[in-house]
């Protein structure tokens, strides 16, 4: 079966944990408007992502891309490190 070229979702967020082997936890924040009051509020999601070379550290700003499920909670993979953390 031929593989289809589909657009995969991407997200940019901050690495909050790299304790797992080849796994990072990325906090992705987004701003949404409250449906009734109209105020802009922050919403966040923690995503598990695959880091094949263990190159990320806590505090890094990274771009991740959706992929096939790699484990129960991990269905994203690291694309690149946008900004290294200072520490």
UniProtKB/Swiss-Prot annotation:
Gene3D superfamilies: Nucleic acid-binding proteins
GO cellular component terms given for this protein: cytosolic small ribosomal subunit
Record keywords: Ribonucleoprotein, Ribosomal protein, RNA-binding, rRNA-binding
A single GO molecular function term of this UniProt record: structural constituent of ribosome
A Pfam match: Ribosomal_S17
Keyword rRNA-binding annotated: yes
Any GO BP annotation: translation
Record note on quaternary structure: Part of the 30S ribosomal subunit.
Record PANTHER family: 40S RIBOSOMAL PROTEIN S11 FAMILY MEMBER (PTHR10744), SMALL RIBOSOMAL SUBUNIT PROTEIN US17M (PTHR10744:SF1)
Task performed by this protein: One of the primary rRNA binding proteins, it binds specifically to the 5'-end of 16S ribosomal RNA.
The family this protein is said to belong to: Belongs to the universal ribosomal protein uS17 family.
Protein name: Small ribosomal subunit protein uS17
Organism expressing this protein natively: Alcanivorax borkumensis (strain ATCC 700651 / DSM 11573 / NCIMB 13689 / SK2)
Gene transcribed to yield this protein: rpsQ
